């Protein structure tokens, strides 16, 4: 007799499937890196196109050939390091001791947070240096500049970013050098390297169990009665309650997701936007005006969504050779 085996439909790894708390993702884990630089960067998703890239994998049957490759375009205007935070280790995890803010902050930040009217930067730096002996980690506050892009908003996005260094003292010295300055994608990323992409996915609203969990559509009498797209049984008589693992209708999409080891194919400056802008601009975005990054494959979220690129926290052993791009499609994406 054939052994009957059917794994459950859908993964419970991401339960509860509810809306993300905020659109700008919060990153709790950063890789250990001794290089004195930021460990992450933010950009805005523009859209997708395709390119012909020479396959450099020696074990691939298409080695040395031009391969059709889908790519995602991210517009990455320079981000600004607006603050420094010192953390101490407590019995309940890391806790902020103190922080330093930069001078001459962008006036658009007042749309997002309350800025201090009177602030003594020198005293704040002296305070953070005074608690360095009990500091466990140093991180920086970074904000974006959406007003220079085609994203229709002026309010900056603020996120906390890890910084490289062997110890808190090295991290603090690097952070003080970067405080108040702009950081470009070319300063911290390289072509051919792998990064982690973190973003909030595209929202789908309230969906049924078939689309949300992928359960089988019932047949026969159930379909004729108009009940084909529902769960046949939501549990036994005892225990007299519904388990949380049972597939039910509800919110789908708009979740925080991380995609590991996405390859960067190209990092270009604002002078090279003609090589990527299609006829009529990208659908639901417009034209790229600043530095941009081409990432192999797809990324979470719709166009205009903030995507944070992080240094890989679980790097793979694949080659990080310089990609050779022979063609990038700039044909109109209207009606595609």
Swiss-Prot record:
Q: Name one GO molecular function term.
A: structural constituent of ribosome
The keyword Hydrolase appears for this protein: no
Q: Which InterPro entries match?
A: L3_arc_euk, Ribosomal_L3_dom_3_arc_sf, Ribosomal_uL3, Ribosomal_uL3_arc, Ribosomal_uL3_CS, Transl_B-barrel_sf
Recorded hits in Pfam families, A to Z, give:
Ribosomal_L3
Ranges for region Disordered: 1-34
The regions listed as transmembrane in this protein's record are none
Q: Name one GO cellular component term.
A: cytosolic large ribosomal subunit
Cite the entry's keywords alphabetically: Ribonucleoprotein, Ribosomal protein, RNA-binding, rRNA-binding
Gene Ontology BP annotations: translation
Which family is this sequence assigned to?
A: Belongs to the universal ribosomal protein uL3 family.
PANTHER family reported in the protein's UniProt record:
60S RIBOSOMAL PROTEIN L3-RELATED, LARGE RIBOSOMAL SUBUNIT PROTEIN UL3
Function, as annotated, reads: One of the primary rRNA binding proteins, it binds directly near the 3'-end of the 23S rRNA, where it nucleates assembly of the 50S subunit.
Q: Which HAMAP family match?
A: Ribosomal_uL3_A (MF_01325_A)
Q: Indicate the quaternary assembly.
A: Part of the 50S ribosomal subunit. Forms a cluster with proteins L14 and L24e.
Q: What is this protein called?
A: Large ribosomal subunit protein uL3
**Organism of derivation:** Methanobrevibacter smithii (strain ATCC 35061 / DSM 861 / OCM 144 / PS)
- Taxonomic path: Archaea, Methanobacteriati, Methanobacteriota, Methanomada group, Methanobacteria
Q: Which gene encodes it?
A: rpl3
């Amino acid at each position: 007799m054939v052994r009957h085996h059917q794994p459950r439909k859908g993964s419970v790894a991401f339960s509860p499937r509810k809306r993300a708390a905020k659109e700008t993702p919060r990153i709790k884990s950063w890789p250990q890196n001794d290089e004195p630089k930021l460990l992450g960067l933010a950009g805005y998703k523009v859209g997708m196109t395709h390119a012909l890239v020479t396959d450099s994998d020696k074990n691939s049957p298409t080695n040395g050939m031009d391969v059709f490759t889908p790519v995602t375009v991210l517009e990455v205007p320079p981000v600004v390091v607006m603050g420094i935070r010192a953390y101490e280790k407590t019995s309940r995890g890391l806790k902020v001791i103190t922080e330093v803010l930069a001078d001459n902050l962008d006036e658009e930040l007042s749309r997002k947070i309350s800025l201090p009217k009177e602030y003594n930067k020198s005293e704040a730096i002296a305070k953070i240096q005074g608690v360095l002996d009990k500091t466990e980690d140093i991180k920086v506050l970074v904000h974006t500049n959406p007003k220079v892009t085609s994203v229709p908003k002026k309010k900056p996005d603020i996120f906390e970013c890890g910084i490289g260094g062997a110890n808190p003292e090295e991290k603090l010295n690097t952070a003080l050098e970067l405080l108040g300055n702009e950081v470009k994608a070319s300063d911290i990323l390289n072509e051919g390297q792998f990064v982690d992409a973190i973003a909030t996915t595209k929202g789908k609203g309230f969906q049924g169990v078939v689309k949300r969990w992928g359960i089988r559509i019932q047949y026969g009498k159930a379909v004729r009665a108009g009940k084909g797209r529902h769960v046949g049984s939501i549990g036994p008589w005892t225990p007299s309650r519904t388990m949380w693992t049972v597939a039910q209708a509800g919110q789908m999409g708009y979740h925080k997701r991380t995609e590991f080891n996405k390859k960067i194919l190209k990092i270009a400056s604002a002078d090279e936007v003609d090589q990527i802008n299609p006829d009529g601009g990208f659908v639901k975005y417009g034209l790229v005006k600043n530095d941009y990054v081409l990432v192999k494959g797809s990324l979470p979220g719709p166009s205009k969504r903030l995507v944070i690129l992080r240094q890989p926290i679980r790097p793979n052993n694949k080659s990080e050779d310089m990609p050779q791009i022979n063609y990038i499609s700039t044909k109109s994406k209207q009606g595609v």
